[in-house]
Amino acid sequence: MAWQNERIDQNIYSQGEVDKWVYSTCNICSVGCGCYTAVKDGKIVGIKGNGDHPINRGRLGPKGENQWYANNAPDRLTTPLIRNKEGTLEPASWDDAMNLIAQKAKQTIQEKGTNSISIYSTGQGFMEDYYTLAKIGRAGLQTHLMDANTRLCTATTEFCLLQSFGADGTPASFDDIDETDTLMLFGHNVAETGTVLFERIMDRKKRTGKPYLIVVDPRKTLTAKEADLHLQLTPGSNVALLNGLISEVVKNKQIDTKFIADHTIGFEEMAESLAEWPLEKSEKYTGIPIETLQLAAEKLGTTKSLVTTTLQGTYQSADATTACVAINNLHLIRGLIGKPGSGPLHMAGQPSSSANRTAGGVGTYPAHRNHSNPDHINEIAELWNVEAMTLPVGPEKGIEEHISMIEKGEIGLFWNIGTNSMVSLPNRQRAKKAMAKTFVVVQDPFLTETTAVADVVLPAALWGEKEGTMENADRTINLVRKAVEPPEGVKSDFEIFLDFAKRMDLKDKDGQPLIGFATPEECFEEFKRVSKGRPCDMTGITYERLEKENGLRWPVPDENSPGTPRLYSDFQFHTKPDDAQSFGKDQFSGRALTKKEFTDKNPDGRAILHPTRYLPPAEQPNAEYPLWLTTGRLVWHWHTRTKTGRSPILHMAAQHGYVEIHTEDAKKMSIVQGEMVRITSPRGWIEVPARIGDAVQKGLLFVPFHFGSWEKKEAANELTADFVDPLSKQPQFKQSACKIEKVRKDHKMASGESMEFIAEQYGLTVEDLKEANNLTSPYDIQMGDTLEIPLSIVNVPIQPYMPYRGKI
C-alpha cells in the first residue's frame, strides 16, 4: 500500500469561504500530485491536495502548495511586446505581434529553406500544446528543428530506453517503489526534487523497514542522509561505478541465465566489456572504499526485487546514456524487470516533459514513431492528411546544435516557449550572443532574462487558467481543469498556436485547415487516434475518466483497460524493426544506426544489452582550475524562479544563490561562513556567498542553478561547460572545472583602531575578522598590520526544511 493514510495539505488565502474547488494536477515536478484549485471572485486563492489521488493521497510539496501565487503576481504580462528600432520592448496588439511572427516565419522559409525555424518549448505545458506544436512544426513549417528544455533535464531518459528496449516509456512505476526490497537512486535527490515521492518512500520505510535504500550522489543531500548506503562517488564516475558493480554480479554468477537467453541479446559483448573491471578499478575512479562497493554489489546481486531511479545527477553527467544503459543492463541480467517491485524508473524533472516526448514536440514523431522508418512516416502522413515526402526526417538536433546553427546564420527564427533559456542553458553568455543573430520570439507569463533578448514577447496563460493533460514520470496521464480565465489580454499556449496556424494558412493536402480541432479536448481525441496501436496507446482515455479515476497510466488501449502499472510484464520488448521507435545509435559515437544494422542484430522483441565503456568527463580540474563544480536544485525553488520567486514564502526561504564548499577547503583559504567569494571557470565568473559544511566532498563546489539575473553575477550557468552526451545530446552540467577566490578588501590598521571598531565599520563581528585572518585573539594584530576584510557576510541558512515534516 502506498500510504498508511491520507493527509490533506492546504494553502489558501481567502476572506470567507471559497466559491469553488476545481479538479487539477500540480504543475511543478514530475511526481504528478492530484490537487484542487480554490477559486473566489474569479481568482485562484489557494490549493489543496486530492486525498483520493493514488500518487499523493492529499499531500503536496512546498513548491506545489505555493505555485498559485504566480497567477496573482502584479507583474504579469498582459499585452504583447515588440522591440522597436531603438531597442526597447513596447506594447503592441495581438494582431500586430502575431502578424509580425507569421511574416517573419514566411520570410525565413523563403530565404533559408524549411529547416530554418527553431521551436524550443518546455516540459511544463500540456500534451495538447505539444501535439499541436508538433503538427504545426512538422506538417506545417516542415522543420525538424524542434526541441525543448527537456533536452537539458531528461533527454537521456528517452535515449537509454530506446537503446535497451526499443521505445520510450519507463518500465516501472511508483507502485513498484511500494513493493520493492531495494531502491537505488542514481543522482536523484528526491527529498528536494520530488518531496511527496520522498514522503511516500519514507512512509513505507518507517512502517516496514523497507526498502533498503542506496543513494548514489557526490553530495550528502537530504536524500543521502536517509540512505542505508550512500555511494559518494567522484563527479562523472557513474559508469566506472556501474561497471564494477555489474562485473561483480556477473563474476559471482548472480544472474538470471534463462531470462538472458530467452529475452535479451548482446550478453557476451556486454560481459566482455566488463572483464577488466574489478571493484578495485571502480574504487580508483569513484573514490568509494572497496568495502562499500562490495556491500553494494552483494545487495544488487542477491536482492529479490530492485527499483532504480535516475535523475539529473546522472542525466547531466559525462556518458549519461551509457550510465543509464548500464542500469538497464543490471535489471536485464538479473531478470528484475516487468515484475512487481522491479524495473528501472527513469525519472523526469518537469511535470509534463514525458508528454512532450510522447506527443512529438521534441525529436521524434507523435506516439513514439520512428522518423527513420518510412512506414511510420507514411502512417503519420495519412493521419494528418499530408504528403509523406513533405515531412522532415533525419537525426534530431539538440538545443546546443540549434545554437550552433544560429551562430552560422542558418536559423532565421527562434521561438522560445515557456522556458527561461538565458538562465537555464549552459555557457549562457554564448547563448546570449547567439540570440542577437536571429529573430527571437518569447512566449511567457512574465518578463524574464530571456525576454531581454526577444524581438517579440507573447503573454501566456499559467496553470489554472487553461485546460489539458500532463504525463508524469511513471506514465500517468493526469488532467488539469481550467479554474479561472487568464488576465485580460493573455492567451493560452494552445490558443496562440491555433492563431499562428491560421495566420500561416497551413493546409492539409486537400486544402483544408491543417489544424482541425478547436479545443484541448478535441485535440486530445485526435491524439488518441494517432496513438492507437503504438506503445503509448491512449485509445481508452477520456477527460471524464481521468477526473473520475484520478489519472491513468498508458498504455490504455480500450475503455475497459485500467491502465498499465508496469511495462514488459510479458517480457516482449519493442525491438521488432516494424515496431521500434528507433533503430538505435552506436553506443559510443552516437551515430544513428541504419535499419539493416538494427535488423542484423535480430533483436526480434528481445531487450538489447550493450557494452559500457567508461570515459572520464571532457573537462577536469587542472592547475588553473583545481576544483570540480556541480549544479542542482533547492527544495524551495523551481527552475529559474519565474514562478516560485513570486511566492513570498518560497522567495524568503531562498533569496539568493550561494556556493557550498567543504569545511577543509574553506579553512585552507580562510573563507568564512556567508562571505562573498568569486567562482571562475574557463567561461566566466560569479560572486556568491559561501556555505561551509560537509554536504560536498573535498575538492567539489556546488552552486544551485535557480538564480540568474543579468544584473547580479550569480547564475551557475555563467560557469558550466556546454559539452553534450553523444547519444542524448544532453549538456553535462554536473562536471566543470573551476576555482574559488576570496572577494576581500585590505585594511591597514591605523593608530587607535581596534578590531571592534573595524568590525563595526564594515558591518561585521570580531569573530568574522578573527576567522578570516586566522587570529585567535583580537589583540594579535597591531598598528600598521593589514587585515583582510571579508565583504558582504550573508546569512545563508542551513536547510531548515524537513521533507516529510515528521508527520508523513
Residue ranges of predicted features:
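Primarily a LysM-type cell-wall glycan-binding module
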Residues: 744-767, 782-797
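Short beta-alpha connecting loops at secondary-structure transitions
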Residues: 225-233, 459-461, 465, 476-487, ...
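Extended redox/cofactor-interaction regions of prokaryotic respiratory oxidoreductases
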Residues: 131-202, 209-214, 239-243, 284, ...
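Glycine/threonine-rich phosphate-binding loop and adjacent beta-strand/alpha-helix elements that clamp
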Residues: 174, 465-486, 496-497, 501, ...
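N-terminal export/assembly segments and adjacent metallocofactor-ligating motifs
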Residues: 1-252, 262, 289, 293, ...
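N-terminal leader/propeptide and maturation segments of large enzyme subunits in energy/redox metabolism
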Residues: 85-90, 252-290, 368-391, 484-592, ...
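Conserved short loop/turn motifs at secondary-structure junctions
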Residues: 118-126, 284-288, 311-318, 350, ...
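Long, contiguous, secondary-structure-rich segments that constitute the structural scaffold
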Residues: 487-489, 493-558, 624, 640, ...
